[in-house]
């Protein structure tokens, strides 16, 4: 069991995946909240059946998987539906996160959760690492990566915790605006040493 759980988060397009991969290369175990969220609605899962019963069979694709775009559009414009879905999925996701952090074998592990703050997961981690960028960087990167429009990206940014609020809960921050990859790697190496030192104090 890891002695320390680091919560890694940041807004859309902040570069969380890049940072995560650097830690992974150092042998740090990664718990990915997005992967867990997909697993709890796997084909024939109780949660997926509950979604089909509540929203209708249109929300299940021909191959038996969840129709994510359809559901995403539904809950983005309907607060009541979003609340219902969160009440269904969040407890399941939380249980899986706790299980995986307990099973982690590296001295410290990292929980990557884009909505670490929004979904009240802070109590599951010992420290918070924020990948920080300005909004223009978020928009530019996401436009390149996704098929979303600038308006859609801005709506997602507006729905997430503000940059200031994220920084306010941070124990550690990596600025990923215009820094060269060599500097980002150095920042990760420095934090790795710091976290390993902290595990010896637990």
From Swiss-Prot:
- What organism does the record attribute this protein to? Colwellia psychrerythraea (strain 34H / ATCC BAA-681)
Spell out the Gene3D superfamilies in the cross-references. P-loop containing nucleotide triphosphate hydrolases
- Enzyme Commission code: 2.7.1.24
Q: What does this protein do?
A: Catalyzes the phosphorylation of the 3'-hydroxyl group of dephosphocoenzyme A to form coenzyme A.
| Residues spanning the signal sequence | none
The highest taxon in the source lineage is Bacteria
Please tell me where ATP binds in this chain: 13-18
Catalytic activity from the UniProt record: 3'-dephospho-CoA + ATP = ADP + CoA + H(+)
Q: Which family does it belong to?
A: Belongs to the CoaE family.
Q: Which gene encodes it?
A: coaE
Name any Gene Ontology BP term.
Answer: coenzyme A biosynthetic process
**What compartments host this protein?**
Cytoplasm
Domain DPCK: from-to ranges: 5-202
Q: Which GO terms describe its cellular component?
A: cytoplasm
Q: Which UniProt keywords apply?
A: ATP-binding, Coenzyme A biosynthesis, Cytoplasm, Kinase, Nucleotide-binding, Transferase
Record protein name field: Dephospho-CoA kinase
InterPro entries referenced in this protein's UniProt entry, alphabetically: Depp_CoAkinase, P-loop_NTPase
Q: Answer yes or no on keyword Transferase.
A: yes
Family matches, as PROSITE patterns: DPCK (PS51219)
Main subcellular location: cytoplasm
- GO molecular function list: ATP binding; dephospho-CoA kinase activity
């Amino acid at each position: 069991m890891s002695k320390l759980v680091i919560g890694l988060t940041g807004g859309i397009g902040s570069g969380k995946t890049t940072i995560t991969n650097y830690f992974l290369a150092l042998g740090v175990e990664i718990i990915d909240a997005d992967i867990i969220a997909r697993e709890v609605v796997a084909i024939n899962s109780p949660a997926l059946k509950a979604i089909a019963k509540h929203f209708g069979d249109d929300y299940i694709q021909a191959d038996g998987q969840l129709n994510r775009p359809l559901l995403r559009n539904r809950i983005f414009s309907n607060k009541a539906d979003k609340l219902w879905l969160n009440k269904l999925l969040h407890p399941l996701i939380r249980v899986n996160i706790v299980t995986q952090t307990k099973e982690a074998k590296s001295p410290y592990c990292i929980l990557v959760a884009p909505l670490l703050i929004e979904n009240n997961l802070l109590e599951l981690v010992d420290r918070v690492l924020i990948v920080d960028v300005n909004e223009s960087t978020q928009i530019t990167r996401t436009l390149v990566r996704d098929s979303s429009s600038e308006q859609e990206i801005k709506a997602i940014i507006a729905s997430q915790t503000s940059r200031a609020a994220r920084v306010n809960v941070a124990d550690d921050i990596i600025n990923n605006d215009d820094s060269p990859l060599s500097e980002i790697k150095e920042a990760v190496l420095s934090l790795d040493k710091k976290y390993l030192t902290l595990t010896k104090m637990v």
